[in-house]
Regions:
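Hot-dog-fold acyl-thioester-processing enzymes
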Residues: 2-58, 118
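HotDog/MaoC-like acyl-thioester-processing domains
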Residues: 4-16, 72-76, 84-118
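A contiguous binding-surface segment within folded domains or other stable secondary-structure elements
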Residues: 40, 44-100
Length: 118
């Protein structure tokens, strides 16, 4: 029997995660800790991968993480994860993180990376 695999477009599994930077998430300089941001990015990427594959997925590798700017207590962080390539048993996911200042509404890119999930 010939069974066709269901095709999913990247937009169907794109994931948006939102967090608020709290004092416990910051370093002694009052900036969001890089490790906390990478944790949030990993959760968004895992949800994206599992939504796309309809299976439990784990992070296989994280390529270069670029920390472009910082975020402070009270900033709203939005993390966008999207599938960029799919292979037989793995997929590549692009993750970008943005910060938004509550009072001014200014939104800016704070980090990005590419990662593989299996």
């Amino acid at each position: 029997m010939n069974v066709l695999k269901k095709y999913k477009s990247p937009s169907e599994s794109a994931t948006l995660k939102t967090e608020v930077v709290c004092p416990n998430d910051t370093n002694p300089m009052g900036r969001l800790q890089g490790g906390k941001l990478v944790e949030w990015m990993d959760i968004a990427a895992a949800v994206c991968a599992q939504t796309h594959s309809e299976k439990i997925c784990v992070t296989a590798s994280i390529n270069q993480v670029d920390f472009i700017d910082s975020a402070c207590v009270g900033d709203i962080i939005t993390i966008h994860a999207v599938i960029t390539r799919v292979f037989n048993s793995s997929m590549e996911i692009s993750v970008e993180s943005f910060a938004r200042k509550v009072l001014s509404g200014k939104k800016y890119l704070i980090s990005r990376d590419r990662r593989a999930h299996v």
